[in-house]
Amino acid sequence: RFTRFLKAVNAAGNGVEMNKFYLDQLSTHPDLTSPNVLDVLRELSEVATLAVVTNGFDRVQSRRVRESGILDFVEDVFVSEKMDSEKPNRKIFDAALRALGVENREHVLMVGDSLSSDVQGGVNAGLDTCWYNPNHAENPGKVVPTYEISSLEELYPLVMEPEELANVGLKNRRHQL
């Protein structure tokens, strides 16, 4: 892509080296975590199996996920490059659910910040979906999530039973940081 760009703007440079630099830099900026995400993941991982389904290059995404600190709380990470399919194609979700041993999709909630890939992908796979929309963006209405939240803490009542909600924040939980 950088070689084409350099040619299009009639500029000198090595597109292959630019692409390598871009991917290296991208993978060093996890930028996956919003405030409290690790706390929320810790709580949810006590009561549910969590996994990541992400589009991109395995080298980049695996490093980003690893450096974000979320690996302690997820069962697996499914990267589109390794899965030979990407969101919103249902095939990546089908493969991830198979790998996790999930048979009943009624017990699965796809949470994501992209209507076009995360939510549409979940819909395509027959899953309940939750659009994480912290900036209160307008939904153009083409993709309708099952739920919409603006803070990750809003996931607790969607995932947890009432008695589990009462334990949120207790220190005697399984995961400790």
Features from the language model and the residues they span:
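A metal-dependent, Asp-based hydrolase signature
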Residues: 1-22
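Alpha-helix C-capping/helix-to-loop hinge sites
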Residues: 5-9, 25-29, 80-81
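Asp-based, Mg2+/Mn2+-dependent phosphohydrolase catalytic module
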Residues: 38, 42, 51-177
